[in-house]
Amino acid sequence: MKPFHWSSEKNESLSADRGISFETVTVAIGAGGLLDILAHPNQRQYPRQRILVVAVDGYVYLVPFVEEDDYLFLKTIIPSRKATREYLRRGEADAED
């Protein structure tokens, strides 16, 4: 996977507002927390964006990114209850079967 880049101002804002940083997400990805890579659902408005689905401490975050030639530029971090149910709870249900 290509290296990650991001806006330091956005990272500070995310840390203050949401309690999670791009560093935390990249560490989780390195530790095997990358669950999926999705196409952005609004391709008309965001034609070059895709979304990393990342598990961090038992919760799933959606991380939109733009792929450049040499790196992935991370845009923001969105906590997702729906993705947590779909990705983590599904795994628990599969383990019980």
Predicted regions and their residues:
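Ribonuclease/tRNase effector modules and their secretory precursors
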Residues: M1-D97
